[in-house]
Design a protein with these regions (language model features):
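A short acidic, Gly/Pro-enriched loop at the edge of an enzyme's catalytic core
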Residues: 1-8
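Conserved redox-active cysteine motifs that mediate thiol-disulfide chemistry
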Residues: 18
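Glycine-rich, phosphate-binding/catalytic loops in enzymes
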Residues: 25-27, 55-56, 174
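Short catalytic micro-motifs in class I SAM-dependent methyltransferases
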Residues: 12-15
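Conserved catalytic/acceptor-binding region of the Class I
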Residues: 37-100, 107-123
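C-terminal lobe and adjacent flexible extensions of AdoMet/dcAdoMet transferase-like proteins
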Residues: 79, 99-184
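A short glycine-rich, Lys/Arg-flanked "PGG" loop and its adjoining helix->strand segment in the class I
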Residues: 21-36
């Protein structure tokens, strides 16, 4: 029910939202006044090594574009949240070979890139992808492992209390005034 949730936690889900502003507005409706939202999601440096390989091969990006943390903060404010705090970190994953990297990427989820290949690809594509990754991977560790970056964006904000409209003359009941004083 609207206004019934005191804390909303969304871990690694927001970047999958097709319409993030609509989702943030929905969160705003669910939260009670002074409710707290906290989330993590992927940021724009995610899969940068893989995108570099795709670009070198002349392929479209391997995944949809991820939203920058500053834009998430702006969207929180635009949807009525207060005091947004944003942060990010980069995590580097290491894989022994391209097959392990591909398998891990498949387990992560879906690809919303509108330019992705429209049909399923066969064994020939899988072999070509493995070969291109093996031959053109930009960042290998000294022991030969494939390093893949994930940018993790963290954010939290509050749903502010409803404010009283201020006009040339404003009326506030005694009970409302007491409630305002108690909350300070």
């Amino acid at each position: 029910a609207a206004g019934s949730v005191e804390m909303l936690w969304a871990n690694m889900a927001l970047h999958w939202a097709a319409e993030p502003m609509a989702l943030l507005r929905q969160w705003q409706q669910w939260l009670a006044p002074e409710g707290f939202v906290m989330f993590s999601c992927l940021g724009p440096d995610t899969l940068r090594e893989l995108n570099a390989v795709y670009a070198e091969a002349g392929w479209p990006p391997c995944a949809h574009a991820y939203t920058d943390m500053h834009d998430w903060g702006d969207m929180l404010v635009q949807t009525g949240f207060a005091e947004p705090v944003m942060d990010m970190e980069r995590i580097t994953l290491h894989y022994a070979n391209p097959d392990q990297l591909i398998q891990d990427l498949r387990s992560m989820g879906r690809n919303f890139n509108p330019k992705r290949h429209p049909t399923c690809r066969g064994k020939g594509w899988a072999e070509q992808l493995t070969r291109v990754l093996r031959d053109h991977w930009p960042h290998r560790s000294p022991d030969g492992q494939y390093a893949l970056t994930l940018e993790i964006v963290y954010g939290h904000a509050l749903k502010p209390k409803a404010r009283h409209a201020v006009d040339t003359t404003t009326s506030i009941s005694l009970d409302e005034m007491k409630g305002m004083l108690r909350s300070k």
